[in-house]
């Protein structure tokens, strides 16, 4: 780090945060059954549409042996995000379940290439 982060610098940067909503997806009771993969495919299609519309800023599928299936960060408040998730095909089919967590972050932050 080239310079020390002062309290003034912190206050300036922190004043730029905005409201976002973090969604944590976990495997539901129907995960891995029947046509779950096709339902997940449609879930992904929907996520890509939400990304294109600017509502879903970050999408991270989790690929390990845990019950966690993924996370997403929505550029929407918790109520709007709940409405979006309640209409997700994987949620409706019981393939995935979700938790919503209101959060704040810095606009224009991104993942490195």
Report the location of each language-model feature.
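Conserved, structured core segments of small domains
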Residues: 1-113
